[in-house]
Amino acid sequence: MAGGLPHPVLWSTLLNVDTITIGGATVEFKHVFYTWCAMAILFSLGLIVRSSLKVVPGALQNVFEVVIGGLEDFVVGNIGEDGRKVFPLLGGIFLFILFQNLLGLVPGCDAPTANVNTNAAMALFVFGYYNYQGLKRWGPGYIKHFMGPMTWLTPLMLPLEIISHCARPLSLTLRLFGNIRGEEIVMVLFFLMAPIVGTLPVYFLFLLGKVLQAFIFFMLTMVYLKGAFEHAH
């Protein structure tokens, strides 16, 4: 089943890339294949837009300008001018996750974000990146972000903050995985119980859900970066 639709065969199965063998061990490869598909689609759209840039934008250029411009304004409004430096990453995260999510709506495809490994990789990258930015900005003083507002609270706040930060990758991973996989399962049930035409409104509801989940991941990443940039009190 693909993207919640009762489809008998996935494209990855037809191409024999569901699994690969590494050192005698069989490894699931399907989610990697569809991640590459999402990357290829996004990269191709970017090349098309870049090659057809006009003073009077066309339809596709208009869509990209509205989405990217709106996201950049949102980031700068929340983080400040530092947001412009990290926006390419934040915008890339949003579009990358969005296209991965949307693949789940295509018959014969499966959403890579419905696999916990894909989400864990992205969450660990975000964890490393915002801590890197914090260390780059504040140096050893970045540790003050974990120590609380008053010195006497440090023995209590330090372990709590470390646990809180270490839980962030797990939270990002499971939130995206649970919502996307849950949508896939519910959509399968809807399409099995009713004709396709009768479930089209529900289909568009799931489309909205996939956009929302990409935005939530993007927004949480932005919040973590904002915390890393702020001066510790």
Swiss-Prot record:
Q: Which InterPro entries does the protein's record reference?
A: ATP_syn_F0_a_bact/chloroplast, ATP_synth_F0_asu, ATP_synth_F0_asu_AS, F0_ATP_A_sf
GO MF terms held by the record: proton-transporting ATP synthase activity, rotational mechanism
- GO cellular component terms listed in the entry, alphabetical order: plasma membrane; proton-transporting ATP synthase complex
Q: Where in or outside the cell is it found?
A: Cell inner membrane
Broad class of the protein's primary localization: membrane
How does the UniProt record describe the way this protein sits in the membrane? Multi-pass membrane protein
Q: Where are the transmembrane segments?
A: 29-49, 86-106, 118-135, 188-208, 209-229
What's the superkingdom here?
A: Bacteria
Which UniProt keywords are given for this protein, alphabetically ordered? ATP synthesis, Cell inner membrane, Cell membrane, CF(0), Hydrogen ion transport, Ion transport, Membrane, Transmembrane, Transmembrane helix, Transport
Q: Which GO terms describe its biological process?
A: proton motive force-driven plasma membrane ATP synthesis
Oligomeric form and interacting partners: F-type ATPases have 2 components, CF(1) - the catalytic core - and CF(0) - the membrane proton channel. CF(1) has five subunits: alpha(3), beta(3), gamma(1), delta(1), epsilon(1). CF(0) has three main subunits: a(1), b(2) and c(9-12). The alpha and beta chains form an alternating ring which encloses part of the gamma chain. CF(1) is attached to CF(0) by a central stalk formed by the gamma and epsilon chains, while a peripheral stalk is formed by the delta and b chains.
Q: Which HAMAP family match?
A: ATP_synth_a_bact
- Which family is it part of? Belongs to the ATPase A chain family.
State what this protein does: Key component of the proton channel; it plays a direct role in the translocation of protons across the membrane.
Name of this chain's protein: ATP synthase subunit a
Please name the source species.
Nitratidesulfovibrio vulgaris (strain ATCC 29579 / DSM 644 / CCUG 34227 / NCIMB 8303 / VKM B-1760 / Hildenborough) (Desulfovibrio vulgaris)
What does the record give as the organism's lineage?
A: Bacteria, Pseudomonadati, Thermodesulfobacteriota, Desulfovibrionia, Desulfovibrionales
Gene name of the encoded protein: atpB
